[in-house]
Amino acid sequence: MSQTAAHLMERILQPAPEPFALLYRPESSGPGLLDVLIGEMSEPQVLADIDLPATSIGAPRLDVLALIPYRQIAERGFEAVDDESPLLAMNITEQQSISIERLLGMLPNVPIQLNSERFDLSDASYAEIVSQVIANEIGSGEGANFVIKRTFLAEISEYGPASALSFFRHLLEREKGAYWTFIIHTGSRTFVGASPERHISIKDGLSVMNPISGTYRYPPAGPNLSEVMDFLADRKEADELYMVVDEELKMMARICEDGGHVLGPYLKEMAHLAHTEYFIEGKTHRDVREILRETLFAPTVTGSPLESACRVIQRYEPQGRAYYSGMAALIGSDGKGGRSLDSAILIRTADIDNSGEVRISVGSTIVRHSDPMTEAAESRAKATGLISALKNQAPSRFGNHLQVRAALASRNAYVSDFWLMDSQQREQIQADFSGRQVLIVDAEDTFTSMIAKQLRALGLVVTVCSFSDEYSFEGYDLVIMGPGPGNPSEVQQPKINHLHVAIRSLLSQQRPFLAVCLSHQVLSLCLGLELQRKAIPNQGVQKQIDLFGNVERVGFYNTFAAQSSSDRLDIDGIGTVEISRDSETGEVHALRGPSFASMQFHAESLLTQEGPRIIADLLRHALIHTPVENNASAAGR
């Protein structure tokens, strides 16, 4: 027989409670209500092994609460330190809802004494790591942004379950704007947190991700409108958000039939700081465990491109991440025969063992123009909501202020309409490529998933493969050589060597193709252009350029750039190549030649205002300027 919420709380308040969770999820369960859960713990090896009961028709229910450690990203084939933190699954045996008011009347409120408070890395040590990442990783083209953690450590005197429940009570009373505020006790450890960020949720087949980035740290007296407006006008903060939106659009493009539809931006206000955020929605019918695997992990707490970020994290965090940047995922049955999913990223979370040792890991997004000491201060501020006494009064809030709303709306003035459209609007894009087959070769950057969505909107039939797969150009009308991290001159690297060989083959066979970013750089080298490392990398930068006579706003993510002093080259064995370039610096933006085109920027990015049109124009050029016999053989399959 199901027990009442009061009976479940009696069991939770015991000196040695069984595994339990109290979850405040106002966007899912409704404001003022918490989930009270009791269950049995298991340790599946992989996400696919999480045991789920059959769905049913009737009342919705919650089945499993999973705690997914960072090391689980190895399921995607990405590098990670194996710190042996287990994947934990609470099979829910009892569940009820309870109001905040009633719960607060039951929760203990004992004093919490912290001893031996310290960070594992000092501000100076953390700032030095930030400097190394900017110089050695972003500066070498490994990626656009990376998140490196540091950890606050302390011991709670006379620790017991009442200490953790009191800690949770304080967060519940004071923290504002969290997506989940929670306590999860597994038997051997307890997680207490106020995560601002949804990982992914699914209801009635609609999946939602919530990229959050940019941080305004409140001054001691609390936030004020002038500083909020300065924060919203800060290009660095805007760039950080655009980059993580691009990265989560890549994920949504992989799991959703129509890709993602972007909503926002908005101001997310919490007790001690504020962020900016977007929402991305898309329809999906895939197994929730598969969706969790495909979205390991959020770029807001790792970096981008994700695979490259994992390598960087492994280099700079040799001790592992445990559950920091992982997720808590709540899987259920929606009562209609389908699955429900809600999940929060495990940030702003205290990991407490049964002896009372507390670990709170935090990180900062490092981009090309990060100031190391500022990033150290930001990481410290992110821990403040958990380790400080919290303020007696809620801070002033400005999210609905007219000036703030106008400033937020202005951020969408020059970004891609495509990703702001819903799927029905995308179907109205002119599809004059209907039925043509295109092969996309992925070079370790899932921007290719976003390229695929735009190409399908143009009417193309798309196949995506990795550069490391066995594949053939035969049978395709077009080939797109994709972007990726790395130095295009390092031909001793297997991926770079493969791109050189593949692009030379496309040129010699005069097959129509488009090269993007890294592949554009390889093409430039194959055509004899000089390549230079940029003094300041373009990582998530929107620029206005002259693209073969048209003024375009486009998004760049590059450390290297081809150079040319001319707008046109005549190349033996190739023919005439047109060059779109910066007339002052000679930096090459794009190329057009017989049977091919290329672009240094990312037309698929949120930062490129007219991406599908630009891609369509370049593909038309490649097809139109391909010898008749090649077009005929492709079209006549």
From Swiss-Prot:
GO terms for molecular function: anthranilate synthase activity; transferase activity. Pathway: Antibiotic biosynthesis; phenazine biosynthesis. Keywords: Antibiotic biosynthesis, Glutamine amidotransferase, Lyase, Transferase, Virulence. InterPro entries: ADC_synthase (IPR005801), Anth_synth_I-like (IPR019999), Chorismate_C (IPR015890), Class_I_gatase-like (IPR029062), GATASE (IPR017926), TrpG/PapA_dom (IPR006221). It comes from the Bacteria. Transmembrane segments: none annotated. SUPFAM superfamilies: ADC synthase, Class I glutamine amidotransferase-like. GO terms for biological process: L-tryptophan biosynthetic process; phenazine biosynthetic process. PROSITE patterns: GATASE_TYPE_1. The active site is at residues 517, 602, 604. Residues 437-628 form the Glutamine amidotransferase type-1 domain. Residues 1-434 are annotated as: Anthranilate synthase component I. It holds the Pfam family GATase. Involved in the biosynthesis of the antibiotic, phenazine, a nitrogen-containing heterocyclic molecule having important roles in virulence, competition and biological control. Component I catalyzes the formation of anthranilate using ammonia rather than glutamine, whereas component II provides glutamine amidotransferase activity. This is Anthranilate synthase, phenazine specific. The gene is phzB.
